[in-house]
Amino acid sequence: MSLCLWKQCLDRLQDELPNTEFSMWIRSLKAKLNNNILEIYAPNKFVLEWVKDKYLNHLKKILQDYCGTNSPLIKFEIYQIYKENKLKKNIENNNNNKNEKLIWSNIPKFKNLSYRSNINKRYNFQNFVEGKSNQLARSAAFQAARNPGNSYNPLFLYGATGLGKTHLLHAIGNEILSYKYDIKIIFMNSECFVQDMVKALKNNAIEKFKLYYRSVDALLIDDIQFFAHKERSQEEFFHTFNTLIEGNQQIILTSDRYPKEINGVEDRLKSRFSWGLTIAIDPPEIETRVAILIKKADQNNVILSNEVAFFIAKHLRSNVRELEGALNRVILNSRFTHRAITVDFAREALQDILAVQEKIITIDNIQKTVAKYYKIKVSDLLSKKRSRSIARPRQMAMAMAKKLTNHSLPEIGEAFSGRDHTTVLHACCKIEQLRKENHDIKKDFLNLIRTLSK
């Protein structure tokens, strides 16, 4: 009964909350019904307080809908208490089990193993510039760092190159090491895991390899997509993954795409990547780009005016590395020529980059092209009209903007009369689905791609 009731609550919350919100705060909760008290267990105090503050009334309403006047009281606890109670039960149940399995988490963590954390001290949460495009990822990363093995395990961050995924991995490592000096952390690119495994096989040392990776407290792997088509490495990582999760050892992975979109990786691995929390990092919106430029300039002992920062941010939208590269060029030119950094100076220093940017497809261009194709007005696309003759072209334009530009979901939403980023995400998913089911939609999509790419 308790499981059934909690599942009904979860189903309602999943229907009524945005996906990212549900994944971030609700999915990690556990619950049981005890003497008409619904005990809800959160992975840590931060999540507990947040859920209590933001969702308690929502939960009460759902329980009242299902149970009427006999709806249970709600009590919040930290997940650790739940695990300890469960562990006591398991010990009692398995006390006479002589065939008890040996799991890797029970193996002593030998002191003579040397762990190379490879954590770069330059990257931390303090110098990570937060904005709408990355705030969920940053918050989840910080929680995982403060409660390794208990919050969001595994944590999977994905997004295009240069958006801060690697920065967050280093920040997690540095945060953990700041309060747990003796913790064993491995930070590496997935290709290093493959190379280590190949060396272990050549040297007949595969058991040492297994012990090395399965005895860590936190495993941070960057660019997991490079496991594609490496069957033996995937096999070994599959078992390592299972062992670490079973031992409550933290796993954090990054990729340039959503887990299910990683080609050449086994389905069973892709499924496990999504066991915990999966969060996208989008290209930064203009306010975040401006903040990044000013912060990076300050780190170089350069005072950058808001006007110049806005000028650069307006023309360079794709990723943080591109912004840093442009800023470094402006600073270098200023130092060589001994000229002040003004908008005109920045325009001159970046003239070749700006020339390339002008050829890039814009949201404005997409809106005009889509409106012309469907024989409607741009103002209709931006309006609140919901008729299919307007809503479908609007969704198509949003999907085009996501595919053909480097704008973040919030920025695309802003360009469509301030719509929420979840509306844009829904539009992209809807068009993707319709392209598979509806020949006319597929044809429209391809025709618009060709027109915009000329």
Swiss-Prot record:
SUPFAM superfamilies cross-referenced by the UniProt entry: P-loop containing nucleoside triphosphate hydrolases, TrpR-like
GO MF terms held by the record: ATP binding; ATP hydrolysis activity; DNA replication origin binding; lipid binding
Record Gene3D superfamilies: 1.10.1750.10, 1.10.8.60, 3.30.300.180, P-loop containing nucleotide triphosphate hydrolases
Predominant location: cytoplasm
Positions with a binding annotation for ATP: 162, 164-166
Subcellular location: Cytoplasm
SMART domains: AAA (SM00382), Bac_DnaA_C (SM00760)
InterPro entries given in the database record: AAA+_ATPase (IPR003593), Chromosome_initiator_DnaA (IPR001957), Chromosome_initiator_DnaA-like (IPR020591), Chromosome_initiator_DnaA_CS (IPR018312), DnaA_C (IPR013159), DnaA_dom (IPR013317), DnaA_N_dom (IPR024633), DnaA_N_sf (IPR038454)
Region described as Domain IV, binds dsDNA: spans on this chain: 335-454
Pfam family, one: DnaA_N
One BP term from GO: DNA replication initiation
Domain III, AAA+ region, as annotated region: 118-334
The UniProt record lists the keyword DNA-binding: yes
Region feature (Domain II): 79-117
Annotated Gene Ontology cellular component terms: cytoplasm; plasma membrane
Region feature Domain I, interacts with DnaA modulators, mapped onto this chain: 1-79
Membrane-spanning ranges: none
Keywords of this entry: ATP-binding, Cytoplasm, DNA replication, DNA-binding, Lipid-binding, Nucleotide-binding
Keyword Zinc-finger set for record: no
Domain note: Domain I is involved in oligomerization and binding regulators, domain II is flexibile and of varying length in different bacteria, domain III forms the AAA+ region, while domain IV binds dsDNA.
Family stated for the protein in its record: Belongs to the DnaA family.
Described purpose of this protein according to its UniProt entry: Plays an essential role in the initiation and regulation of chromosomal replication. ATP-DnaA binds to the origin of replication (oriC) to initiate formation of the DNA replication initiation complex once per cell cycle. Binds the DnaA box (a 9 base pair repeat at the origin) and separates the double-stranded (ds)DNA. Forms a right-handed helical filament on oriC DNA; dsDNA binds to the exterior of the filament while single-stranded (ss)DNA is stabiized in the filament's interior.
Assembly and oligomerization: Oligomerizes as a right-handed, spiral filament on DNA at oriC.
Name of the protein described by the UniProt record: Chromosomal replication initiator protein DnaA
Naturally occurring in which organism (per UniProt): Buchnera aphidicola subsp. Acyrthosiphon pisum (strain APS)
Organism taxonomic ancestry: Bacteria, Pseudomonadati, Pseudomonadota, Gammaproteobacteria, Enterobacterales
